[in-house]
């Protein structure tokens, strides 16, 4: 369901010339990380050791014994072609050098797994909890919520931890930050303002343009965080987000056999029946004017303007004020606005 996975598949793996290079010099194995998370973990660790970062699509070149020698995420067709040729040539001309490097990477992976979980029960001391919080607070984005920088992930587990911490230690300033984070995410393009549910992350630092893939595990965890926040704050926005997100999961991810689908694709078909990133979630002004009776009010509420603009005349809906604030400003009741 990842956009860049589709791009690399179309550009490289479905390209005859690239396929010939791969088939002539390599045995190609495609791993479903949902089915084999253990295999995914090994090669993700390897790529992180080699490059300092990871992600998907995850591409790894390994020796016949499975030891990784090269890896990365997305590569253009030209980059991937050169990588394949260079690695193949190096292995033919200097296999010992490649094998030595593979051994070092493998040892690095093994070293990273030397730390084992403590299975003995332990009681955390307040000092330990406070120290953990102090490490994370330096990265808090007090303007846009979430954590500093981009891309911006919701990080539901961290928000849940901070929510518990502020409740037990009575930290009003931290609670203010948490509420800002939850509100900004709910107002942002990372949240589907029409259909409910959260995308995986935003590519900018203000939660506007999402990576349009929607993950089951993200939405499940965010439902939990917003529910707990509502218990503490009784903010109707949080309650609405929980209801809308659960409705999205039930409508779009329910497999009707007792299970749920793990994700929704970032790409959907456009008017030419071609897959395009985010086209299902983005709008032109012309489309909205044809659909919305009171377009001007709608456009003001969802910032169909320079604030909400993405690219190619497309807009990602984003809010910047509450229902109450907007209704009052436009001399409407909340029911009239809805």
Predicted features, each with a name:
Residues 1-338:
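Replace the tail clause
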């Amino acid at each position: 369901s990842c956009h860049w996975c589709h791009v690399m598949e179309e550009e490289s793996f479905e390209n005859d010339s690239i396929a010939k290079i791969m088939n002539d010099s390599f045995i190609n194995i495609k791993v479903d990380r949902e089915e084999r998370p253990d295999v995914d973990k090994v090669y993700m660790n390897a790529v992180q050791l080699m490059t300092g970062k990871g992600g998907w699509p995850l591409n790894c070149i390994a020796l016949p014994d499975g030891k990784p020698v090269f890896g990365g995420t997305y590569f253009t067709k030209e980059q991937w072609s050169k990588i394949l040729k260079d690695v193949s040539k190096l292995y033919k001309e200097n296999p010992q050098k490649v094998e030595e490097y593979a051994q070092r990477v493998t040892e690095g992976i093994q070293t990273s797994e030397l730390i084992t979980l403590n299975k003995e029960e332990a009681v955390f001391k307040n000092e330990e909890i406070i120290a953990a919080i102090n490490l994370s607070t330096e990265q808090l984005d007090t303007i846009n919520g979430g954590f500093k920088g981009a891309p911006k992930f919701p990080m539901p587990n961290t928000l849940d931890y901070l929510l518990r911490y502020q409740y037990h230690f009575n930290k009003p300033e931290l609670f203010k930050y948490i509420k800002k984070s939850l509100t900004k995410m709910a107002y942002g393009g990372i949240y589907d303002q029409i259909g409910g549910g959260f995308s995986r992350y935003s590519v900018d630092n203000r939660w506007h343009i999402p990576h349009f893939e929607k993950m089951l595990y993200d939405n499940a965890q965010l439902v939990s965080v917003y529910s707990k926040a509502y218990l503490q704050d009784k903010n109707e926005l949080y309650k609405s987000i929980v209801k809308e997100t659960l409705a999205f999961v039930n409508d779009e991810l329910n497999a009707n056999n007792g299970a749920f689908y793990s994700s929704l694709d970032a790409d959907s078909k456009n008017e030419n029946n071609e897959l395009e990133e985010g086209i299902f979630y983005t709008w032109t002004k012309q489309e909205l004017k044809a659909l919305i009776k009171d377009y001007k009010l709608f456009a003001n509420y969802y910032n169909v303007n320079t604030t909400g603009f993405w690219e190619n005349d497309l807009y990602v809906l984003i809010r910047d004020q509450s229902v109450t604030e907007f209704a009052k400003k436009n001399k409407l009741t909340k029911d009239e606005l809805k």
